[in-house]
Amino acid sequence: MQLLLIHSDFIEFEAKKPTKFAEEVPEEARSGRLDEALCAFIAVEKFDEDDPDAVVAQAAGEIEEVAKRVKAERIMLYPYAHLSSALSSPETAVRVLRDLESTLKSSFEVARAPFGWYKSFTIRCKGHPLSELSRSIRIGEGEVVSQALKSEAKAVSHWRIMKKGGEMVPPEEFDFRGHERLEKFVRYEIEKSRAVDRIPPHVELMRRLELVDYEPGSDPGNMRYYPKGRLVKSLLESYVTDRALEMGAMEVETPVMYDMDHPTLKKYLDRFPARQYAIEADKKHLFLRFAACFGQFLMGHDMTFSYRSLPLRMFELTRYSFRREQRGELVGLRRLRAFTMPDMHTFCGDMSSAMEEFRKQYEASISVLRDAGLDLKDYEVAIRFTKDFYENNKTFIEGLVDIVDKPVLIEMWDERFFYFVLKFEFNFVDALDKASALSTVQIDVENAERYDIGYVDAEGNRQRPIILHCSPSGAIERLMYALLEKQAMIAANGGLPMLPTWLSPTQVRIIPVAERHHARAMEVAEQLNFRVDVDDRDETVGKKIRDAGREWVPYVAVVGDEELSTGLLTVTVRSESTSNQKIKMSVEELRARLQSETAGRPWRRLPLPVRLSERPKFV
């Protein structure tokens, strides 16, 4: 089912002419008007025929939640086939609409426009941030769905914007001028619509740059990585791993699949909001991991450690983790079914220690994203917590907002539905106004008990630790998506897109003017000892320079007769120049710039042949 929910000053309709699918309705039901109403435009879909009752229950819950949030006491149900291209049978649609009307009438004044009629309608939308929302109702796809995911769908959220200093206001009362990206993020979060309606710009870029592509021979959401893409991904993996180890984590490795009937794991599955891949093997029901929690917690159960080891951190870069995301939500690198997740868990002695570690990991995540190429202005912050936690720790929450020095989205629950009491995410909002979570940390108050994890305190007594879940960058693939989308927006505004020099597959391209300059070009490549290639193709210099620009090469150096005689290179620096502005520099000066821009970052060799004439084309 697809829902478009509009909070209106009024909505009125008149049924003009029946189609061959029109339901029979009395004359007085062929027109109607509601003032101060929430209008639900509805398309009942083919998928809904599998379980109409479940669809009605979930749709009623969504409509009721929005109606309460906007304080609407009247609801208009309006059949609107244009919301979907996969409509149900007319019989199912009428049944669902009637049952939905009956369900909502217990709490609201409800009117319903008849199904299958040509109708005219007039509506005046109120125009506040919550006045236009959409919902997609999906009841299963054959995957294993956790109890927590079902709870998440029912959880009632209290949304606020927290300003620096701690003031909280409802989104509809916040002045978003100067915070337009935050406004888009707020709408995306409240609407909860993850379906893909347009292809984001990074999909064209990841293919044109020969980084990543779809793999038609696999399940949707599983990608192939070309040499350049594998290089970028590998560098990010190494960097995030290095940062986790610098934080004091011990690197471990755990299995990718687990027994679904394991008593402890079964309980945890029902507390984690995710859809799992389920497989059968040797009469066992197995599932593929969606994080490193399972293996690290089982390892923690078997460990012996004391308060002297706290905070104790374990880290794994899971290649891969798996989530059976809904097919309509999969696109490019934004949302995948197989992904690489840096996953660190920290055992803390008490809540005070956990909160201090949370703050440190919050700040470390800001640093990780900054070094990868995303500044605070490039993403929005969401902080989510239970009401009890907030009441007891207001100053701490306000301090998190002060660190980022900008308004953040707050989601508060009256009760705890999940295993955590506090979490944050840094969310990237792309050119299509879709948001994706990157870095995150959660304070877990359940799983030490569930997995029987304990440490020995100073008095020799066994205690349960508080556990932090931390991904300093979020999934590596999603970080690549955010970097590409950021550059797409820069290009759309007239800028020159490029990856940071340390992530660029080719850091320097040498362009010989003629064949007699090839030897010097190769010599320069060897002297620089970075990721340097040589465009030895039989093309004009102008064409070679344009191609280097299309590949986002940070430094392009031309070698001709003048360069042979002076020993200097004519270099275009992409970050500060145009093709009409050249800089003369020596090999040593160029190498010094490269060293400065890549200091403290991982390094990999050029992933392709040095000579462009020897390279295969992947796309």
UniProtKB/Swiss-Prot annotation:
Q: Name one GO cellular component term.
A: cytoplasm
Any matching Pfam family: HGTP_anticodon
* Keyword flag Nucleotide-binding: yes
Its localization reads: Cytoplasm
- Binding of Zn(2+) occurs at 293, 345, 469
Entry's cofactor comment: Binds 1 zinc ion per subunit.
GO:BP terms for this protein?
Answer: threonyl-tRNA aminoacylation
Region of interest (Catalytic), residue spans: 201-500
The answer to whether keyword RNA-binding applies is yes
Q: Which GO terms describe its molecular function?
A: ATP binding; threonine-tRNA ligase activity; tRNA binding; zinc ion binding
The cofactors required by this protein are: Zn(2+)
The lineage's top-level taxon is: Archaea
Matching entries from Gene3D superfamilies are given as: Anticodon-binding domain (3.40.50.800), Bira Bifunctional Protein, Domain 2 (3.30.930.10), D-tyrosyl-tRNA(Tyr) deacylase (3.50.80.10)
The reactions it catalyses are: tRNA(Thr) + L-threonine + ATP = L-threonyl-tRNA(Thr) + AMP + diphosphate + H(+)
Q: Which NCBIfam families match?
A: PRK03991.1, thrS
Q: Please provide the record's free-text comment about the domains of this protein.
A: The N-terminal domain is an archaea-specific tRNA-editing domain that hydrolyzes incorrectly charged L-seryl-tRNA(Thr). Catalysis of tRNA editing is performed by the charged tRNA itself.
Record note on quaternary structure: Homodimer.
Q: Mind telling me what this protein is named? A: Threonine--tRNA ligase
Name the source organism: Methanothrix thermoacetophila (strain DSM 6194 / JCM 14653 / NBRC 101360 / PT)
